[in-house]
Amino acid sequence: MKNIKLIVSDLDGTLLPYGQENLSENVKNRIRRIIECGVTFTVSSGRTYNELFGFLGEFSDRIYFTCCDGALTVKNGKVIYGRRIENGDIGMFFSKRSDDFSFVLHGAFENYSFGNIPSEAEKYNCIPVRNIFDVKEKIFKITSFGGKISLPDYCGIRTHWDGGDNSVSQYVNRYCNKSTALSDLQMRLMLAKYDTAVLGDRGNDVCMVKNAKYSYCIGNGCVELSDKCAFRFDCGELALDDIIGRL
């Protein structure tokens, strides 16, 4: 009987080394091997579903995608779990008046832009909007450019990435993280921490460790994660090899 039935892995810095633009065939072959062994594979990342699909689209009907730092999970092109950003919180972005400020609203499958977004945001293939009423789906992440929002204590969002006053910042639902999304998936699959392995490299992966018996820290970029994980490897490929050896 397999000890590991669910594998949840971060993408950037874990499966995808920093500075590398495409997922290596070696990593894809390991994911393919895991699936062939009958184990459920999930990629869990701060990226949007469309971004993750760009890396792992060939597996889209066989794996789960946990996106936007735990804000939603997608399987077979359908959202099975989600913690949206409420319209009242989105309104703070439309209310900010600055010629340099622009932002992108990320839905599960579409992206909406307000203001003159920089060229780096063109990859999102945004639908321009004039106000919140032009947005036709639930929003799970917001990316701002040329400034950031000062979040009041009572609001329902948190900063996922703080790029500073004049750079890129990202926001998600205050109550989402990778652990809550993983807990939901474990419940759906009727699995427990003893069936689960997680891989990560940064602080936002620390919360997943309590959900898994087998925890892997990739690299040395986060001391807290390294201290809490059961295993440490220099790269994601070696960690996947170790997991495959346990199947």
Spans of model-derived segments:
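Asp-based phosphoryl-transfer active-site loop
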Residues: N3-Q20, V209
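Active-site metal-binding loops of divalent metal-dependent hydrolases
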Residues: L11, R47, D201-R202
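Short active-site oxyanion
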Residues: G38-T42, D61-I63, F140-I142, Y194-T196, ...
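Short, structured coil segments at secondary-structure junctions
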Residues: F59-D61, D69, P152-C155, N211-A212, ...
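Conserved acidic, metal-coordinating active-site core of Asp-based
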Residues: D99-N211, N220
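Phosphate- and divalent-cation-binding pockets in alpha/beta enzyme and binding domains
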Residues: E51-G54, A181, C207-M208, E224, ...
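Asp-based, Mg2+/Mn2+-dependent phosphohydrolase catalytic module
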Residues: M187, N211, S215-L247
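Active-site phosphate-binding/coordination module
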Residues: N22-S119
